[in-house]
Amino acid sequence: VILGFESFETANAYGQALGEQDGILKKLITTVEAPAPQTYFLRHRSLIPEGVSIAAVTIAPHALDAFYAFTSAFKAKVLLDTSRASAETMKGLPPNYELAWNHTTLRALRVDPAITYLQVRYGDEGALARAHRILAKYREELIGHHEFIRFNGRVEFAGLTLVRFTSEDRLNEIISDHEKMGAFVFNPHRYTLEEGGMKQTDAIQLAFKRENDPKGLLNPGKMIAFEDPNFDFASGQSYLFPGLEARAAAAQG
């Protein structure tokens, strides 16, 4: 099912509420901010009005009645229900899971090769409000995309925000500002475990690496702590594996 909402905020409020309905069996809750669905979901253009943000969900057939009873309390418009749509409507349409997670990013890239993305966690308390504040601040550069998940028994969401890329410096500014505003970015533009994740040494990972790959033959340069135990993660500088320094210098001319 694809539902339309007047704003990304209302789509997310719905996504959070639907995720918390344990009696409605579902597999996917994805929210995407306008104008991304209209611009990047090419096969769905005739179904999604301009300015409408969407929630793409996958609901078990036996739970559809309960799903619609729940959804009736929200200002949501049903744009597509594959259980009711005609064969003509369904012709050529991908399943909802191909609009979700990094499929969303890939569809955007097919239309605009300058698009990139960030992986964001917005904390616990006030996560939705925090996400909306960040998106509002960077309205010309960011487009919201959230995936609702169950984590440690709680319904949360992950941000796979679409970014209109202009420069590496600007991207780093946006990442830094996310963190100043209380969000945490798992940076997909870094190749090391630490920079792409928790930005600190994982002692268990490091011990496992030393035990099983003492000479560092597997994925060299992937773990900063193995190559440079004294690296300062607070410096704001990207780590460059020594074997790549010459190549990087050559690329910069």
PLM ranges: what are they?
Residues 33-39, 44-50, 71-253:
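Conserved glycine-rich FAD pyrophosphate-binding loop
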Residues 1-30, 37-80:
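A conserved active-site cap/scaffold subdomain adjacent to cofactor or substrate pockets
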